[in-house]
A protein has these predicted regions:
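Short alpha-helical transmembrane segments in multi-pass integral membrane proteins
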Residues: 1-31, 89-156, 198-253, 309-374, ...
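N-terminal transmembrane alpha-helices
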Residues: 18-50, 54-55, 69-84, 88, ...
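Transmembrane helical elements of multi-pass membrane transporters/channels
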Residues: 29-48, 150, 184, 213-217, ...
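Transmembrane alpha-helix boundary and packing residues in multipass membrane permease domains
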Residues: 34, 38, 50, 87, ...
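Helix-terminus/linker motif at the lipid-water interface of multi-pass membrane proteins
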Residues: 39, 43-62, 131-138, 194-201, ...
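Small-residue-rich hydrophobic transmembrane alpha-helices
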Residues: 61-121, 158-177, 283-347, 378-400
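Hydrophobic transmembrane alpha-helices of multi-pass small-molecule transporters
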Residues: 73-76, 188-192, 217-222, 293-296, ...
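Short runs within selected transmembrane alpha-helices of multi-pass transporters and secretion channels
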Residues: 82, 151-169, 177-185, 206-219, ...
Length: 458
């Protein structure tokens, strides 16, 4: 329920109080560590591909490319589900009701543990089936299944990391998750070099390094949480299903479902590309790693926007929440245009960082040419989505995401993939096309919501 309160509720720590002060520096200060964490996460995934591309086989490169798509689906869905925890914690801080946060965390621990157990069974025991459904090239099928199975065995660490990061971001602390990812990235680089370059374990070595890195980062996160001075208390009795579970799931489930179908569309896209051959598959995998870097600023804006907006909505300051969205769009457009120019003009050079295979580089660059406008379009879309997430309009976020995925991106990518002499450029163009539709939908909903709230508060 939206309140039309005029007063501001202040938090004890000015750095984590988003309800007062200039928006741009506050948002930038909170966003930068999130951006840093995302940069390291992208580097984390890129290192696997880079090391396997240099010291492994082309089949191993395809296996990591396809297998990482599966793991990305799981990770992104868990992240969106955890967004419910972030938003609810930030809301309680804004409303000055921290006594409920312990129940949120305890309930979340139970829910995410059950989720991790289910994912473990699926990824470990059905790895080969999943790889087959992804239409992994025959020569890379065994390596892909091995990669998925090994990473699936460490899914508890991946889920735990995302839940703990959501907790810290909800408290307005975006620096601690940055430290966790930095530790994981260092461990992963060392592991890749030892297992892939040293012991020549190919895709399996990259998977083992990934699991080890996640385990170390979770240990660091728990240690930091125990030492941190928290504005609330956690009791043993909080670790059970409780009324707060329904609340954060009500926020997070629509986002998780939307993200699941979005990532499923990218898995389908990966399958479409895999049918075009090993070189196209490997080229698409390289392009996806570059895309991950290109999307960093819009993604960090979306994550930071949710906490920023949620605090202000909780404090009854809707105008400031709207202003933060427009500030985020401005930041995103500045960087989005620069990234577009880099990807469009130097996509082949960027692709060459991951492999020396000329055919793979050419396929990667072809996809990037179609995808490039997405770097500008998402600057607008992701800031709006972050605003709606923080404003507890996650059901709408799910609806607009499904329209983009099911009615635009997936049909267009499929149609382009079955054309004679199918072009990776046209397949890549399905992403910015669907985002443009999403922007139009969100603008219409924003205008409608603003009119509705004004009438309600009149």
């Amino acid at each position: 329920m939206l309140l039309c309160a005029k007063g501001k509720i202040l938090l004890k720590n000015d750095k984590t109080d988003f309800t007062q002060g200039r928006i741009l520096p506050k948002l930038a200060f909170f966003m930068l560590p999130i951006l840093g964490a995302l940069v390291l996460q992208a580097a984390y995934g890129a290192v696997d591909l880079l090391v396997v591309g240099r010291f492994g086989s082309t089949s191993g490169l395809s296996a990591v490319s396809t297998g990482s798509q599966v793991l990305n689906l799981v990770t992104f869905v868990v992240t969106q589900l955890a967004m419910g925890v972030t938003v609810l914690i930030a809301r309680y801080l804004g409303e000055k009701r921290p006594q409920y946060i312990g129940q949120v965390i305890g309930g979340a621990a139970v829910v995410f543990t059950l989720l991790a157990a289910a994912l473990f069974v699926v990824l470990v025991f059905f790895a080969r089936l999943i790889s087959s459904l992804m239409q992994a090239p025959a020569e890379a099928l065994d390596l892909t299944a091995s990669y998925v199975r090994i990473c699936g065995s460490g899914i508890f660490f991946i889920v735990a990391y995302n839940m703990l990061s959501a907790l810290f971001r909800g408290l307005g602390d975006s620096r601690s998750p940055l430290i966790f990812v930095l530790v994981a990235c260092i461990v992963n680089v060392i592991g890749d070099l030892v297992l892939v370059a040293g012991f020549h374990l190919d895709a399996a070595g990259a998977a083992i390094a990934t699991v080890a890195a996640q385990a170390v980062s979770v240990i660091c996160a728990i240690a930091m949480l125990l030492k941190k001075e928290l504005p609330f208390k956690i009791h043993r009795s909080d670790f059970k299903p409780n009324p707060q579970c329904k609340k954060f799931l009500g926020i997070g489930l629509p986002l998780a479902l939307q993200e699941f179908l979005t990532q499923l569309s990218f898995l389908a896209l990966c399958a479409f590309v895999n049918r075009l051959g090993l070189e196209a598959s490997s080229g698409y995998g390289v392009a996806c790693k570059i895309v991950n870097f290109a999307m960093l600023i819009p993604s960090s804006l979306m994550q930071s926007m949710a906490s920023f907006v949620s605090q202000n909505v909780g404090a009854g300051n809707k105008k400031r929440a709207e202003q933060s969205m427009f500030t985020g769009i401005g930041i995103g457009l500045v960087f989005g245009c620069a990234v577009f120019a880099l990807v469009w003009c130097k996509g082949d050079v960027l692709s060459g960082l991951f492999t020396a295979d000329a055919a793979v580089i050419a396929n990667s660059y072809a996809y990037l040419m179609g995808f490039a406008p997405e770097t500008i379009a998402t600057a607008i879309l992701f800031s709006m989505v972050g605003y709606f997430n923080g404003n507890d309009k996650t059901l709408w976020v799910m609806v607009q995401g499904l329209v983009q995925t099911l009615l635009v991106r997936l049909p267009m990518a499929y149609i382009m993939s079955i054309q004679p002499n199918a072009s990776l450029t046209m397949i890549g163009l399905s992403a910015p096309t669907s985002t443009a539709v999403g922007i139009l939908l969100n603008i219409c909903f924003f205008l409608w919501l603003k009119r509705y709230e004004n009438q309600t508060c009149a």
